[in-house]
């Protein structure tokens, strides 16, 4: 789809509308928000928050929505991914960690930002596409699965380009194992 929420939403809607996809499987690299989310750790996302969406006040400046909440989400800020697909993924690759993802059109590159996302949303990882993909799938009634591998971790020095390749390879290996069972 390319980088960012807009490209991801457009690609997801195209796949659903034109190709009538029965499910969307998203995979890619992410930033780790906790020490447990170490470099190349691969995980399955249970829920995602699109944290830069903000309709906090109405025209009279009264609080209306929580940060990350969409008007049609019934008070929820998280979009749940498909439980059946998550269970299939975990049966195929039991060592996958279930995680919460924070998603926005923003590259998070400081430990302070990472800590803030973890503290505010309980997120384990962050990235720039899944919020849009999950929302598009939810609105179209299409199941969604997301697999992510950590390319940059909190408090670690690394060669980003090298870690991107290592994390990508780790994620693809898990994806292939899961696809064999679908």
Range-by-range predicted roles:
Residues 20, 38, 97, 122, ...:
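Short loop/turn motifs at secondary-structure junctions
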Residues 42-44, 144, 163-165:
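Short, hinge-like loop/turn segments at secondary-structure boundaries
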Residues 1-55:
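N-terminal catalytic or cofactor-binding beta/alpha core of small enzyme domains
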Residues 11, 15, 84, 88, ...:
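Short, well-ordered amphipathic alpha-helical segments that serve as non-catalytic structural scaffolds
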Residues 33-120:
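Mid-sequence, gly/pro-rich, charge-dense loop/helix-turn segments that line enzyme active sites
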Residues 154-182:
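His/Asp/Glu-rich mid-to-C-terminal helical/loop segments that flank catalytic regions of hydrolases
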Residues 106-151, 155:
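A C-terminal functional module that forms or caps the active site or interfaces directly
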């Amino acid at each position: 789809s390319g980088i960012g929420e807009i490209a991801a939403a457009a690609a997801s809607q195209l796949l659903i509308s034109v190709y009538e996809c029965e499910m969307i499987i998203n995979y890619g690299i992410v930033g780790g928000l906790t020490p447990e989310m170490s470099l190349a750790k691969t995980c399955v996302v249970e829920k995602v928050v699109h944290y830069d969406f903000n309709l906090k006040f109405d025209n009279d400046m009264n609080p209306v929505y929580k940060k990350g909440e969409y008007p049609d989400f019934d008070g929820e800020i998280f979009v749940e991914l498909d439980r059946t697909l998550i269970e299939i993924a975990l049966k195929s690759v039991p060592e996958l960690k279930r995680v919460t993802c924070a998603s926005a059109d923003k590259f998070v590159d400081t430990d302070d930002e990472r800590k803030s996302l973890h503290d505010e949303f309980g997120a384990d990882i962050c990235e720039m596409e899944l919020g849009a993909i999950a929302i598009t799938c939810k609105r179209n009634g299409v199941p969604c699965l997301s697999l992510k591998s950590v390319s940059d971790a909190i408090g670690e020095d690394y060669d980003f380009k090298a870690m991107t390749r290592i994390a990508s390879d780790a994620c693809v290996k898990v994806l292939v194992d899961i696809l064999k069972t679908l």
